[in-house]
């Protein structure tokens, strides 16, 4: 009887260790994902508002993966800042799809890591001028955002046919 009781207590203790040790990282990753999703919601709001606050969500060493035709492997925050400010001067942006953020995973471990992914649709418009009519185009994109432990965006990639959208607006 004493041996059975010891075995049962040992099994319960082992199960508790497994349960609590497995539950903590998932809970931590879930909390990081929720916090990072809120950051991305604000990033999108700042982008639509053409606000310099947009850039404050990124670490100074943040990079974007070059995903366009013949794009460089990485694009720095400084380069993106110049490009986005020029684009804001020329175009208006509106997120027209719901923000259904998806949890990302670590590429090596495949474990949920707090990164944020999603499929979004943006309306990009160009105002009329004396010689042109107003135009707009909808572009569907896949975007991902990886964060450092301080909640700053470190890595971003955007896949979508943005070049075709801009070409249409500028023709």
What are these regions (language model features)?
Residues 152-171:
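Low-complexity, intrinsically disordered terminal/linker segments enriched in charged
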Residues 20, 60, 149:
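Short, ordered coil/turn segments that flank beta-strands lining enzyme active or ligand-binding pockets
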Residues 22-52:
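Short, low-complexity N-terminal intrinsically disordered segments enriched in polar/charged residues
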Residues 1-34:
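Bacterial Sec-dependent N-terminal signal peptides
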Residues 58, 120-124, 160:
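Short beta-strand segments enriched in hydrophobic/aromatic residues
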Residues 47, 57, 64-65, 70, ...:
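Mature soluble domains of exported/periplasmic/lumenal proteins and thiol-rich metal-chelating peptides
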Residues 117-150:
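Exposed beta-sheet edge and beta->alpha loop/turn motif
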Residues 52-116:
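A solvent-exposed, acidic/Ser-Thr-rich amphipathic alpha-helical stretch
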């Amino acid at each position: 009887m004493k041996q059975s009781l010891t075995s049962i207590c040992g099994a319960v203790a082992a199960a508790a260790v497994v349960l609590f040790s497995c539950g903590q990282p998932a809970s931590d990753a879930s909390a990081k994902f929720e916090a990072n999703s809120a950051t991305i919601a604000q990033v999108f709001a700042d982008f639509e508002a053409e606000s310099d606050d947009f850039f404050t969500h990124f670490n100074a060493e943040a990079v974007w993966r070059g995903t366009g035709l013949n794009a460089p492997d990485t694009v720095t925050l400084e380069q993106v800042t110049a490009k986005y400010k020029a684009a804001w001067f020329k175009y208006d942006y509106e997120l027209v799809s719901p923000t259904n953020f998806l949890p990302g995973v670590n590429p090596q471990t495949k474990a949920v890591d707090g990164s944020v992914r999603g499929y979004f649709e943006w309306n990009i418009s160009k105002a009329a001028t004396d010689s042109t009519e107003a135009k707009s185009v909808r572009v569907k994109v896949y975007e991902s955002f990886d964060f450092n432990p301080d909640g700053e965006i470190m890595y971003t990639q955007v896949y979508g046919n943005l070049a075709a959208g801009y070409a249409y607006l500028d023709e």
